[in-house]
Amino acid sequence: MKVWVDADACPGVIKEILFRVADRAKVEVTLVANHWMRIPPSPFINLKTVSSGFDVADDEIVKLLSAGDLVITADIPLASEVIDKGGVALNPRGELYTEQNIKSILNMRDFMDTMRASGVQTGGPAAIGASEKQAFGNQLDRFITKHHKPS
């Protein structure tokens, strides 16, 4: 089991949680981004840079992930592709995307896109607060405890 991170849009506080968990649980965490970013020295933390372009990092994650891998992303279409390939997707606010909820979440995203395209101001998400950080950490810990078997 590996953890893949859609790193370009992933908040720094979430990356820090992932870095700590990678070393503590000895789980491989790979950040995929279209630009270089600083990562701590660790045998469990990797950075894969891809070329710039629409969905290039997303496509790379889908190409590399295996069934049972965890992907950290707020990108709902990417989460849907991950689930279709047998992976698990978790957003930075601690919401687990599943086969049971991804279709309704995708429909809501598409509806909001339509609203924005028609000129309705929908606003963006609020900054990640303490409760979201805790929810993310809890979901991550539960997933790793259940699915990761250190070698």
Swiss-Prot record:
It comes from the Bacteria. InterPro entries: UPF0178. It holds the Pfam family DUF188. Transmembrane segments: none annotated. Belongs to the UPF0178 family. NCBIfam families: PRK00124.1. This is UPF0178 protein Shal_3046. It comes from Shewanella halifaxensis (strain HAW-EB4). The lineage of its organism: Bacteria, Pseudomonadati, Pseudomonadota, Gammaproteobacteria, Alteromonadales.
